[in-house]
C-alpha cells in the first residue's frame, strides 16, 4: 500500500472539516425525541440525549438558552427542540446545540391546558358565586354524550337502579376528535332552547389527554358558563380533570358518579312518603286535641247558660266541626290518593309493581286507621254532649214540675216556702206543670 505524502489529515483537521460540513449543510433543524441522561451541572448548562426506538443523539443547551424554557426537563419526557448540528471536536462527537425546547405530545397539551385555565380563571368563569344550585326534585335529565359509548350505558344503568321514574333525554354528540367541542356546544344550545329537562349531564368515559381534549375548549367553556340549565361535568375517570369540570356547576369524577349525584334512591322516596303520612297523623291528632279542648270549654260555658239555647248552639257547632273534619279528611285522603296515582303512573313505566302494591296497601291501611280514629273521636264527643244535656234536664225546674210538684209565689212573685210568709186574704199564684192557679188564702195551718 502506498501512503500519500500531501493528503494526510490530522484528527483535529478531520473533526473540524466534518463540523463545517454538517453546520453548513443542515443548518437549523426541529427534532422530536425522548430525553435520557439529563444533567444540569452548576455551570447552568444542560446536557442530555434525545432518542427514539432506533437511534439517539447527544444534545447541549447552554445557560443563556435554557433560561427561557418554562418547565424542568426530566428523563423519559417527550420534547420538541430546535437547534443546530455541530461537532464537539475534542472527542469527535457530533451533537445538537439546542436553542429552544417545548413539551411534545401530552406535555404540550398540558402546557396549553394550564394557559387556558389561567385565562378563564381571570375572566371569572370558575368563580364559586356563579355556580348554580342543582334542582332538589329532578324529574328529567338531559345527557350530552355519544349515544353508543360506555358512558351512556353506565348512566342509564345507575338511574334505572336508583330512581327508574327519572326520564332521560339524550342529546347525541361527538365526544372525541376534531370539531367535537363545537358539536358539544351545539347540543348544549339545543337543550337550552328546548328547556325540556331540569339539568344537563355532560359525560364520556376515560381516555388519554388527547382523547379528552375537546372538553378543554375555550368555546365549550363559555357555552357551559352561559347555559341557563345547570350543568354537571362527569368526564373520564377520577384522575382526569378538564376545563369543563372547572366551569360546570358541579363536577362528578365518573359518569356513574354523575348519575348517582342526580338521582335519589327509591328507598329515600318511600321514606319521604312515610314522613308525609306521619305528619298527617300528627296533624290529625293535634286537631283532635284542639277540638277536645274546645268541647271542654263549651261544656263549662253550657253550665252557666240557658240549657236549651246552649244545647242548640253546641249541636250546630258540632255539626259544623263534623263537616269540617270530614272535609279535611276527605281532602287529605284525596291528596294522598292523587299523589299515589302520580307515583303509580311514573313507576309503571319501569314496572316496580310489587313495591308500589306494598306502598298502596300500607297507605290504605293507614288511611283506614286514621278514618276509624276520627270516627271514634266524633262518636265519643257526641256521647259527651248527650250526657251533658241529660244532666241539665235532670236539674231543670221544669223537670221537677213534671214529677207532680208545684211552685207557689205571692203577689210580688216571691216564692212561698213557709206558711208564716202568708196572711188570710193574701193572693197567691201556683205554677203547675201545665198552667197556673190563682188563689186567696182563707186559712193558715202551722204544722211546725
Curated annotation (Swiss-Prot):
> What reaction does this catalyse?
Exonucleolytic cleavage in either 5'- to 3'- or 3'- to 5'-direction to yield nucleoside 5'-phosphates
The main location class comes to cytoplasm
Q: Which InterPro entries match?
A: Exonuc_VII_L, Exonuc_VII_lsu_C, OB-fold_nuc-bd_dom
Task: Tell where it localizes.
Answer: Cytoplasm
Gene Ontology BP term (one) = DNA catabolic process
GO CC terms in record: cytoplasm; exodeoxyribonuclease VII complex
Keyword field: Cytoplasm, Exonuclease, Hydrolase, Nuclease
Which enzyme class?
hydrolase
Signal sequence range: none
KW Nuclease (keyword) present: yes
What Pfam families does the annotation carry?
Answer: Exonuc_VII_L (PF02601), tRNA_anti_2 (PF13742)
Primary role:
Bidirectionally degrades single-stranded DNA into large acid-insoluble oligonucleotides, which are then degraded further into small acid-soluble oligonucleotides.
| HAMAP family cross-referenced by the UniProt entry | Exonuc_7_L (MF_00378)
Alphabetized NCBIfam families for the sequence? xseA
Q: Which protein is depicted?
A: Exodeoxyribonuclease 7 large subunit
Native species of this protein? Shewanella sp. (strain MR-7)
The upper taxonomy is: Bacteria, Pseudomonadati, Pseudomonadota, Gammaproteobacteria, Alteromonadales
